[in-house]
Structure formats: structure tokens, C-alpha cells
Amino acid sequence: MVYHVSESTKVRTMDYSMSPISDDDRESIMDVFNYYVENSFAAYPETKLPYEAYDMFLKISKGYPTAAVKDKKGSLIGFGLLRVHNSMPTFSKTAEITYFIHPEHTGKGIGTKLLNHLEEEAKKKGITNILANISSLNPRSIDFHKKNGFIECGRFKRVGMKNGQVFDTVWMQKIT
């Protein structure tokens, strides 16, 4: 699948493709994830994860939609995945979402296209609820989700601490 993204402030068009994540994406995905580990509250670990931690992404997303977003040269510019929310069959129609866009490519509509792609793939699997778990210290993500149809459905106060800063976890939900 190839998408064309045009920014109103720029004349050029950027081509990129989405395909399921694979072992070939290990280092690139971990590099993008670790950028957010070190520079934001978007990823919760306090220190970079080793490349072997990629196996965790594969394990938690097994049987769920995933996507690696690559530019026309084949370089990874983002990734996303859905994962189990609760392993009980009662919750089989609910999934949690995780996605990260390379910092040089944010604000270009790629995150929205990735979210839409994952939502469409989720519908094909019968998933009707998508949950996002977001740090209260990540207002851009909260705003992004609101703009894309998520509503805040819960907040756990002062449950996280990263780099000495305490934060809430904000739970957002989109019913597809």
C-alpha cells in the first residue's frame, strides 16, 4: 500500500508504504522507540532498551495488526501495533495501540494514516475498541488522539515516575 502525503506548507509529495513489522525492522524500530525513551514521556522506560527487546514487540502483537512505515528508499519512518488488552476471551474485541513516528517525520500526517491503517486492520479482525495508554506529560499525544476520535475514559493519578517526574496515565478509547 502506498500513500501520498502532501503538506500545505511544502510543495513536495512524500511516498511511503506500510507493511507488517518483521525481523528486518528490528534495529530501526528499536532506534525510533529508544529515541522516545530518551527524549520524551511517550515511551515509559527510563533507559534505552537493547535490540533484543524487539522480540517483546513481536510477542505482544502476535495475531494483531502491525505496521512498519517506510519511505520510498525503504528506510523506516515509523511503526505501530495493536496488542492484547486482557487475555480473557471476554475482552477479545478490545486492543491497545502503540505507535511511534521518527521525530523528523512528525506533523506530516503519517501518524494519522498509520492510525487509520491499524483501525481498518483491527476491524477486519473484529476488534471494536482501541485503547491508548498515554502519559499526562505527553499533551501532544493526548491532543492527537482527541483529534482522531478518542475520548478520555480514565486516569490513574500519579502512578508513573520517569526521570524524577511523577505523571498520571491517561486512558483513551475509540470505539470503531
Language-model-derived ranges and their functions:
Residues 15-29:
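A short beta-loop-alpha structural element at the N-terminal edge
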Residues 31-48, 57:
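Helix-loop element at the rim of GNAT/NAT acetyltransferase active sites that forms part
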Residues 99-104, 108, 120, 136-137:
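Active-site acidic-Proline motif in GNAT/NAT acetyltransferases
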Residues 107-124, 143-147:
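Conserved acetyl-CoA-binding loop-helix of GNAT-fold acetyltransferases
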Residues 122-134:
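Conserved GNAT acetyl-CoA-binding A-motif
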Residues 132-142:
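Conserved beta-strand-loop-alpha-helix junction that forms the acyl-donor binding cleft
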